[in-house]
Amino acid sequence: MTKQRQDAWSEENDLLLAETVLRHVREGSTQLNAFEEVGDKLNRTSAACGFRWNAVVRHQYEKALQLAKKQRKQRMRALGNGQPAKKRLLYQPPAVDPEIIQETAAEEPVKTETPSVENEQPLMSGEHMPFVDESFKEELASLSHLLSPQTPAAAPEMTMNDVIRFLQNYEGNHEQSSALKMENERLKKENQELQNKTEQLEAEVQKLEKDQKTIQEDYETLVKIMNRARKLVLFEEDEHASPSFKMDRNGNLEKLAE
């Protein structure tokens, strides 16, 4: 079946692409295999599906993709007893009828030698690729359809809606970054003002404590002076007090003891 280029992607197509990629990643397959399955279902090339995933759909399912990778690692560890397991492809593209290939070859006036699909391994085969970081392996698998010589070169599908969405996201991110920068500057200024006010209040508290100490010392000194004055007054009153006399039976005056 010849796959025709289609510019319009619907929400159902994006949802199918996301669900298929997440399922392949979660069950230990590759994103490239998921692109092939979606391409056959939607009559699109795997290159178009890969470009749509990386350019538009992926950023909407980033958390789900990370969760799927985590579940895949746990599943592989459980099946392989802690050893890294090889990926298995969940989807096998339908075989091409040999008669169609012969008819196509007969119509072409000149046929150049190309590597056989059966005899040549894919550029980034999940089974023969050396063990590297899983996320890096996924990125290589998603780009292998663009680098493989056996895949027909297909122009990336970019619609006007994709361009507008990208520019809107870019402008929104730029405005958000500017707003965050302004908010950061405002918070820094407010923090500096609060620090200055705190230092001012601390200085006032120290001054009040010093004044209170001075007042306390003056009060104690005043109390001491008042006590001394009171004692002095009592002493003078005792000195000036007139003596008391008492007359006995014989008519003599006797000074009373104080």
Curated annotation (Swiss-Prot):
One record GO biological process: sporulation resulting in formation of a cellular spore
Disulfide bond found in the keyword field: no
Cellular component GO terms, alphabetical: intracellular immature spore
Induction: Expression is sigma F and sigma G-dependent.
Coiled-coil region: 177-218
InterPro entries: DNA_bind_RsfA, SANT/Myb
UniProt keyword Transcription present: yes
Compositional bias segments (type: Basic and acidic residues): 246-258
Keywords: Activator, Coiled coil, DNA-binding, Repressor, Sporulation, Transcription, Transcription regulation
Ranges for domain Myb-like: 1-57
PROSITE patterns membership: MYB_LIKE
Annotated localization: Forespore
Tree of life domain: Bacteria
Main location: other
Gene Ontology molecular function, alphabetical: DNA binding
Stretch list, region Disordered: 238-258
Homology family: Belongs to the RsfA transcriptional regulator family.
NCBIfam families linked: DNA_bind_RsfA (TIGR02894)
Record function comment: Seems to improve the efficiency of sporulation by fine-tuning the expression of genes in the sigma F regulon, particularly the timing of their expression. Negatively regulates spoIIR and its own synthesis.
Protein name (database record): Prespore-specific transcriptional regulator RsfA
Gene giving rise to this polypeptide: rsfA
